[in-house]
Amino acid sequence: KIMLSAYGKTHASHGNFNNYLGVPLCLASMPNDTEYAVIEMGMSAKGELSELSKLAIPDVALITAVSEGHIESFNSVEEIADAKCEIFEGMDINEGIAIVNRDITTYERCLQNIDRAGMQNVQTFGKKVDAGVRFVSSEILEDDTLRLSYSTDGEALELVIPLIPAHLAGHFAGAFAVVKALKLDPDAASAAISSFIPLIGRGALLKVKNG
């Protein structure tokens, strides 16, 4: 949301309103003059994301991760990947853009699902060298800030932000992939995210005595 807000009025999911109740509420509360909407969709069983995607009809859909978090409802991580790929089912197969984390172990499985869905536009992000938007490196600076380096189709992108948990730097790559998919200027997103501060209780910098 922070990045897209640099380009226009942006509406986003609140809290963990990402299920069959939260997504409709988020959509229903969207102002008429919204230019960009960031709708988080979660699932705990097969079929849930399919219904949510057909309700939201996203222009761009992003899979950030596939893990064993919902394994109680599935037989394998591959089945979880199949269920997560339902997020593409509500999209226009010619105009919609599917974005996938290149680093996940089920990446090829996701591509198979995307191919079966008929999606024509697929983009990637991650640390691997062939990712469309690549998280290249991070460096802690003397003033307790963090320099993050990314590459977008070979073009360097760098920003300096307050210290954050390492996994968020990877999430930023996914957000930059959305910016790229929408054909927006990444410099505006970089400037917007430079002032990012994690939520209270997350990513706080604590100084302790040695030993």
Where do the protein language model's features map onto the residues?
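Phosphate-binding loop of NTP-binding sites
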Residues: 1-102, 108-119, 173, 182
